[in-house]
């Protein structure tokens, strides 16, 4: 909770002035109920990255239900996935279920892959259509796990970047990018 976080910050840092804000898809109602300011997620992350990592050129964020790429230079430009959760945390969770694991298990499996298979990344329904025959044919789970992460990376590059190069210092944000296998595929 916020109070626990503030106490922990106080215990570690002592007296300091804080200005907590709430962001995210469900944040506006929560901010109103708690009487805490709300800030748009893309503004919050862009300001934080600009302050902490001024050398950053691109931000790639994979959330639970959406994905964004923000080009910071030469002028800010943000792109977000459309109406489908393809290439997001929800997509990863859905695909992990098909392999009888969770996102962390998918990550562990992917580290041992040998072969990559093409899997649709735009939509979970299409990806499942690609994945199920591979499962039925006995494809190795590590190969399928890495193929799922490759589909996520492909969706980010093809769908969000849409031909614009991703170069320079890239900052990865979001829970799905916690998984090393996915981060390495993006690099």
Task: Enumerate the language-model features and the residues they cover.
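Phosphate/pyrophosphate-binding loops at sites that engage ATP/ADP/AMP, CoA/4′-phosphopantetheine
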Residues: 6-18, 156-168
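Short beta-strand-loop/turn "lid" adjacent to the catalytic site in phosphate-handling enzymes
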Residues: 10-43, 70-79
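Glycine-rich beta-strand-to-loop/alpha-helix junction loops that act as flexible
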Residues: 23-26, 168-178
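Gly/Thr-rich phosphate-binding beta-strand-loop-beta motif of the actin/hexokinase/Hsp70
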Residues: 56-73
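Glycine-rich phosphate-binding loop plus the immediately following alpha-helix
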Residues: 74-115
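Adenine-nucleotide phosphate-binding core of ATP-dependent small-molecule kinases
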Residues: 127-160
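Conserved small/polar residues in nucleotide/adenosyl-binding loops
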Residues: 185-187
